[in-house]
Amino acid sequence: MKENKNDFKPYIPADQVVPEFTVTALILGILLAVIFGAANAYLGLRVGMTVSASIPAAVLSMGIIRIILRKNSILENNLVQTIGSAGESVAAGAIFTLPALFLWAKEGKIDSPSILTIFLVALVGGILGVCFMVPLRQALIVEEHGVLPFPEGTACAEVLLAGEEGGNKAGIVFSGLGIAAIYKFIADGIKLFPSEIGYDIQAYAGSSVGIQVLPALAGVGYICGPQISKYMFAGGTLSWFVLMPMIALFGKDATIFPGSEVISTLAPGSLWGTYIKYIGAGAVAAGGIMSLIKTSPLIVRTFKQAMGSMAKNRATADAPRTQRDLPMPIILGIIAVIAVAIWLLPIFPVSFLGAVLVVIFGFFFATVSARMVGLIGSSNNPVSGMAIATLIISTLILKATGTTGTTGMIGSICIGSIICIVAAIAGDTSQDLKTGFIVGATPKLQQIGEMVGVIASSAAIGYVLYLLNAAWGFGSNEIPAPQATMMKMLVEGIMNAELPWALILVGVFIAIVVEILGIPVLPFAVGMYLPFSLSAGIMAGGVVRWILERRKAANESEEKEKKACIERGTLFTSGLIAGEGLMGVILAICAVAKVDSKFVSPVALPQIASLVIFIILLAYLYFLCVKKNNKTN
């Protein structure tokens, strides 16, 4: 371990000073933070997962700074991606929890959360996530260099280093962005062809087959890879082709809680919404908790390291440039001010006990998250599992201390939201600091940049949530908000004891069986919870990645080209996700302004046309990847 640390030399040496924290980097980073935050908010509310924004942010930064502004500094580009990627992490934490407040407002239980409340919850969680990561940097990033791989952080560094040699990678991202935006506008704006095709299988009551033919879903499947995609698809298959037909077969003319209608009269979509949601919620909750239990030895070890690192941390003014962190007195002061603000400010519906829980859970799960992403990457970080564990414990504590009813439920969601954002930002910060460690960035400036990204995206996320809710409503087919819906049900169930626990326990035991079989529970459980058509669209992208990965490489040159081939696909599909997300936000604005009907096509193509167009998109993705292009390698 020590050998790795001492032998490693960053790309930019500590004694070399190059442009880093510049006005250009700040403006571009803030812009990308807002863009990727909005795009990932839409994606997460629609499919229940987000993707890392570090690599597309780095590529776009290189393209804009070098091509448009005629400047070039690898550390400047690194700071842009550090600021820009914070937007995705704030969005991930916020959309997994905060829509629960809107759902309660829709039911008339509470008033809708204000923009200021959303901003402060996101801001507090984001700043705490950065602060908690500062004392962990030395232990996780430096001391364990060569031990913890930090997949996204290392890959982002490789992209930045490759960018020093030139290339056209930004063009690939922009092409994906443009294609997806146009595709989404034609499908869901003009409505020339349906974005979802499906058929209820009459001979197999209760089942339905379909696919959402949208670019972002293919992008998610490609980036997550064939393994995660097939686990989600398997979960969806279990729900829609086993559980739902069984409910239809055995329920028949019965009315079973929580439903209020005879089961035989329910269409597959209603069966899913009435019963499968609860089974899926039980599986997701169990999966999140099991992932924490499995990593408990790792959690304890990392926590001990973090405490030791905090005890040893000193002022770093005299340290080499590449080892300078924000001073611990400043970090501890920020944490103390935030804790007092959570306790005293009326905008936070949280008591003194809640403020204490935020700090304790926050540091604990920041430690867990930073270590987890170092091992398995940000895309596999069980942030929602940490939020579930926090919600269960905090709700039980609040209920035991007499804070019940809507006050207790709001307090639980706010605590869970802050912790969810803490975990997401801590994971993102650790990946960014690893990238900086490899390229030779200044940690202190990255930590400040991360906070800038948090502030910018926190200021925007409230407006994005209000916009999407006003356009379609959380819990709708367009934005089902799966995690937030599940968090809402979980808190209600603990506070009011009104949940259909039999259905939830079915999901829990399915998750246990899946775990025994050695299958990752969370992607399987999310597939159970989401509409099958979503999992099918994601699987399509995963199949393209699977075909590409199966190509044989006879020598080192072909292996290098195969790696470049996969990378081209990652850049293009990152653009697909961003493009559809941004167009989704634009269409939401049109829906709220009531101008969306003005550009609807008088002609609508049949469902088969949608499938053909989607296959053409997948084929284009494949041929883009396999096409040899020296400029992008």
Which residues make up each language-model segment?
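Alpha-helical multipass membrane-protein architecture
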Residues: 1-633
